[in-house]
Amino acid sequence: MSLFFYYGDECPHCEKMMPLIDQLEKETDVKVERVEVWHNDENLHTLESIPEQKDCGGVPYLWNDVSRKGICGEATIEELKSWAGA
């Protein structure tokens, strides 16, 4: 797995991104691992260990472990496809 979507359960911006993540997976051959960080300290530690994430300061945060590209905040489907390399 190389594509990750870090989110918080009650995060309204994250909720807006969920359907776009689903759309990305349906329209391409990619799979995005969803990682909840507000109620899981281990997942939060994993997110905080990404050096490129330090300037973001929150969720949603999308991380491509192959290209080392991240997206901080909400994004369009076109931005997601570019980020995923799809």
Show which residues each predicted segment covers.
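Local sequence-structure signature of Cys/Sec-based thiol-disulfide redox active-site neighborhoods
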Residues: M1-E33
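Generic recognition of short, well-ordered alpha-helical segments
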Residues: E15-P19, H45, A75
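Residue-level recognition of beta-strand->loop/alpha-helix junctions
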Residues: R34-W38
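Short Fe-S-cluster ligation motifs
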Residues: N40-G57
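Disulfide-bonded cysteines in secreted/extracellular proteins and peptides
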Residues: C11-C14, C56, C72
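Non-catalytic, surface beta->alpha helical segment in thiol-disulfide oxidoreductase systems
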Residues: G58-A86
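Short alpha-helical
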Residues: P12-H13, D41-E42, E78
